[in-house]
């Protein structure tokens, strides 16, 4: 399978250690910093998540149009397309995947004028492995709760 700008990450040695609840979760990590991207990917894989990685916002947007993800973790300042630009496209396309913005400078001025661009969570860089995993778990729990509520509401009308 050819993926332009997307780095597919799989680790068969981690497969035996997968947490049951995480094994079906697919996360997209978007970051132009190779070290941060690879460390994030490794931590998530070791915790049982299926992970895809993109080297910038444009590659991340391409992945979002091609594959289904349960969560996106993105930097903001990247070449070709920023994390905010990718988030704006995601929201305009009415994609409901939750987004964690992992950045050293969160552009709060953007959120003041465009509140719909707020990510579901922010992760201040540099961040620890524990901070990353706790934020991922918190956002996924919140999204699961929201999805269950929506499904319950719609089940009454179907």
Model-derived regions, located:
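Acidic catalytic/metal-coordinating carboxylates
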Residues: 55-59, 82-85
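Active-site beta3 strand of CheY-like receiver
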Residues: 67-73
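Hydrophobic/aromatic residues positioned on beta-strands within the core alpha/beta folds
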Residues: 102-103
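Non-catalytic signal-transmission and effector/linker regions of two-component phosphorelay proteins
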Residues: 1-26, 130-158
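Receiver (REC) domain active-site loop signature in two-component systems and cognate sites
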Residues: 78
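Alpha4 helix (beta4-alpha4-beta5 surface) of REC/receiver domains from two-component response regulators
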Residues: 85, 106-123, 130, 134
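Short hydrophobic/Thr-rich beta-strand motif most characteristic of the beta2 strand and flanking loop
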Residues: 48-55, 63
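Charged docking surfaces used in two-component/phosphorelay signaling
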Residues: 38-46
């Amino acid at each position: 399978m050819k993926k332009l700008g997307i780095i597919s990450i799989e680790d068969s040695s981690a497969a035996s250690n997968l947490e049951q609840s995480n094994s079906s979760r697919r996360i997209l990590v978007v970051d132009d910093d190779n070290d941060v991207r690879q460390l994030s990917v490794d931590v998530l894989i070791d915790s049982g998540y299926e992970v895809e990685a993109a080297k910038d916002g444009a590659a991340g947007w391409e992945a979002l149009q091609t594959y289904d993800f349960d969560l996106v973790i993105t930097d903001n300042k990247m070449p070709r397309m920023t994390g905010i630009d990718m988030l704006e496209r995601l929201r305009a396309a009415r994609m409901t995947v939750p987004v964690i913005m992992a950045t050293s400078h969160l552009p709060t001025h953007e959120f003041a004028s465009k509140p719909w661009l707020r990510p579901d969570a922010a992760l201040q860089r540099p961040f620890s492995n524990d901070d990353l995993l706790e934020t991922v778990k918190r956002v996924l729990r919140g999204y699961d709760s929201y999805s269950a509520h929506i499904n319950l509401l719609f089940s009454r009308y179907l």
